[in-house]
From Swiss-Prot:
The keyword Transferase applies. Signal peptide: none annotated. It comes from Thermoanaerobacter sp. (strain X514). Its EC number is 2.1.2.10. The lineage of its organism: Bacteria, Bacillati, Bacillota, Clostridia, Thermoanaerobacterales. One of its GO terms (biological process) is glycine decarboxylation via glycine cleavage system. GO terms for cellular component: cytosol; glycine cleavage complex. This is Aminomethyltransferase.
Amino acid sequence: MDNLKKTPLFELYKKYNGKIIDFAGWALPVQFESIISEHEAVRNAAGLFDVSHMGEITVKGREAFNFLQNLITNDLSKLKGNQVLYTFMCNYNGGVVDDLLVYKYSDEHFYLVVNAANIEKDYKWMKDNKGVYEVEIENISDEVAELAIQGPKAEEILQKLTDTDLSEIKFFCFKDNVKIAGIECLVSRTGYTGEDGFEIYMPNKYAVELWEKIVEVGKEYGLKPAGLGARDTLRFEAGLPLYGNELSEEITPLEAGFEFFVKFDKGNFIGKDALLKQKEEGLKRKIVGFEMIDNGIPRHGYEVRAHNQKIGYVTTGYFSPTLKKNIGLALIDSKYAQLGNQIEIVIRNKPLKALIISKNFYKKNYKK
């Protein structure tokens, strides 16, 4: 673990019996108590995640808006100050460089939150595509810690630590300079679990103190520290993509089923021509949800078959703690992608029957 990057909370993991793994070059807890108990805490009460490995990049300057509007697939013109936008950065072939959140302070100041595995790649991509735009791009990832408190009790717990009325921070909005336990933070009503909750950004030096305060206050509400394992099962049930699984440089937003975040009518952006061509010609493959009929747990990379031939592969698969079923997502040949179709997942060299169902396994409980 010595050669892995560590968040400011690393020393605290031991105290909470964190089981550490290598995630994209970071030493992070896959679980504390257990993946299932942490998952259930988030669905029913609250969970606290260390997500300080995520990247933060600021874009400032006279042409910050125009620069980003050309870089991303979603429409920045629909975003008001103190709102957050989910979007993709695509390459010229329409594949996904990354999926990210864009926080808008003003047309000349944006704050981007990107995936940990892609920080350096994204930063380089942005600089390489800066062209003549008058903007300053700064990677501040090493200075910022991030905690996520997620679950139906998240607001009630966090409210105990601040005088700011958190109910005024609406879904996909944020407020800066919010004092939580006396620490100035940026707080957004966002998350990656399908539940209500907040993501909290602060300087590294305050992360341990804030984590401990939230755990202390949250105990009586059933809050539990949660690791990457529960984070993955939660996002998966909610139909949220994971970069490297449902999204990649080779998988487009359209194939992943996220055309909603690709605004073809907004003017030009990188990847638009390729995506438009793909849309007009029709998708050759797409991501579908499936439920196992035979007994077996599907895993990332497992082969998917139909009529004795390979038609794709599993992108994510789990026993769902909420639904108590073995379910998965798979990228398959479009002609087999109709709801209700029977497919086979090859598990330990054995083709097992599965049924194609909606990808929205779990109804999201956001506070709009």
